[in-house]
């Protein structure tokens, strides 16, 4: 079972990825983790990637595709894999197809932008312990204070509203076209495309996922 998971930052992909991995015994392949592992292992592609990254440049699609092919040939991918954060663009999706990497299911978790902004910009963290609160969904007993220590809570830079909106803008510009792309691939009968409402409870989304991934 070869799966691609699409969705904006904050849509709940990580939680559902965990569910899929546990339910179906397939590894989650994140390009970031894969790059780090290849660099650490000192593989030819890893060394090439390190050279590019050390120069402060972006790793090319060809190099990433090479790493993906190398990774999915490993034993733990025998039953399939879950690609997270890749492909991000249509050229990357084209390159995957050209390299014979076929996909069984493309899953989109759809959450409106305003809901994502509310979810992410409402997060508060206790820097000392890493405890996470939310002003709406999981508020501390005393506003702005950690329940255990009474110390001030902070907003992570990634959760600042302006940052969240910027990341959403990049997602819509780069990744949203993939929704249309894979819709066409599915219409041609070459993959299955599933769209889920990510504003539902985690359990409801997991249940719906399980019903289509049988």
Curated annotation (Swiss-Prot):
A cellular component term from Gene Ontology for this protein is: cytosol
- Which one GO biological process term can you cite for this protein? AMP salvage
Instruction: Write out the pathway annotation from the protein's UniProt entry.
Output: Purine metabolism; AMP biosynthesis via salvage pathway; AMP from ADP: step 1/1
Instruction: Tell me which residues bind AMP.
Output: 31, 36, 57-59, 85-88, 92, 156, 167
| Pfam families found in the cross-reference section | ADK, ADK_lid
Give the residues annotated as coiled coil: none
Enzyme Commission number(s)? 2.7.4.3
Q: Where is this region: NMP?
A: 30-59
User: Which reaction(s) are listed as its catalytic activity?
Assistant: AMP + ATP = 2 ADP
Q: Does the keyword Translocase apply?
A: no
Organism superkingdom: Bacteria
Region LID: start-end pairs: 122-159
- Subcellular localization: Cytoplasm
Its keywords, alphabetically, are: ATP-binding, Cytoplasm, Kinase, Nucleotide biosynthesis, Nucleotide-binding, Transferase
Q: What does this protein do?
A: Catalyzes the reversible transfer of the terminal phosphate group between ATP and AMP. Plays an important role in cellular energy homeostasis and in adenine nucleotide metabolism.
Protein family per UniProt: Belongs to the adenylate kinase family.
| UniProt note: domains | Consists of three domains, a large central CORE domain and two small peripheral domains, NMPbind and LID, which undergo movements during catalysis. The LID domain closes over the site of phosphoryl transfer upon ATP binding. Assembling and dissambling the active center during each catalytic cycle provides an effective means to prevent ATP hydrolysis.
Q: What is this protein called?
A: Adenylate kinase
- Species of origin reads Shewanella oneidensis (strain ATCC 700550 / JCM 31522 / CIP 106686 / LMG 19005 / NCIMB 14063 / MR-1)
